[in-house]
A protein has these predicted regions:
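Short acidic, low-complexity intrinsically disordered linear motifs used
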Residues: 2-15
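Pre-Walker A adenine-sensing motif
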Residues: 16-27
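Short hydrophobic/aromatic beta-strand immediately N-terminal to the Walker A/P-loop
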Residues: 34-35
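The Walker A (P-loop) glycine that initiates the GxxxxGKT/S ATP-binding motif of P-loop NTPases
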Residues: 38
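Conserved glycine(s) of the Walker
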Residues: 41-43
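Conserved substrate/cofactor phosphate-moiety recognition/catalytic segment
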Residues: 48-123, 135
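Conserved phosphate-donor/acceptor-positioning beta-strand/loop module used by diverse small-molecule
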Residues: 132, 149-168
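Conserved GTP-binding G-domain of TRAFAC-class P-loop NTPases and closely related GTPase folds
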Residues: 162-194
Length: 194
């Protein structure tokens, strides 16, 4: 009949990658909040770019702010305390992380984003977070609800990656996180998700 049945081992040897487009609330253009959780190097950025209709969302990514501030520091006289830092150096990554945190960028930019939100066309927002602690969500949720976002349109997605793969990803990406921070971010995400 020309059709042959694969043995179980042959079946396992065939490596199928099934990719799915994630459409929150059937792909609505407004009013969706996504908390995208996952440890450092887990592939959250890859998931956003390839599986999540990025064009429909404002993406809040602390790493993008770090890069922007470093570029400003390196090309202007602003922020001399971070001038010349490298995202490939884990110590520098910690310094720039502290710099952004101390400036209150996350809070200020969220306040600006939500300041003039119209409930009918509130922007879709992805929060790219490690979720190493539940405060990653708990700190912003009241502001989102106050702005008029409907709780049924607030989603939590966990990008779960084998830790060994995340370590390899960390070594080859543009921003390298210290080993202890890597472990804490993955343990914290797992604890928060469970």
């Amino acid at each position: 009949n020309g059709f042959s049945m694969l043995t179980f081992l042959q079946f396992l040897a065939e490596k199928y990658l099934e990719e799915k487009l994630i459409m929150y609330n059937q792909g609505k253009r407004y009013g969706q909040i996504v908390f995208l959780a996952g440890g450092a190097g887990s592939g959250k950025g890859f998931a956003i770019r390839n599986f999540m209709e990025k064009e429909k969302f404002k993406v809040r990514d602390v790493d993008a702010w770090k890069t922007a501030f470093m570029k400003l520091a390196d090309t202007t006289d602003k922020y001399p305390e971070i001038k010349g830092l490298s995202l490939k150096n884990p110590r520098d990554v910690m310094k720039i992380h502290k710099f952004v945190k101390d400036k209150g960028i996350k809070e200020k930019s969220l306040d600006l984003l939500l300041r003039d939100v119209n409930v009918k066309n509130a922007p879709n927002v992805i929060f790219d977070i490690t979720m190493k602690d539940a405060n990653d969500i708990g700190d912003v949720l009241p502001k989102l609800l106050e702005a008029g976002y409907d709780p049924k349109n607030i989603h939590l997605t966990w990008v779960l990656t084998n830790y060994a793969i995340a370590i390899k990803n960390n070594q080859t990406r543009t921003r390298t996180v210290a080993d202890d921070i890597m472990l804490l971010s993955h343990e914290g995400a797992a604890t928060s998700m469970y």
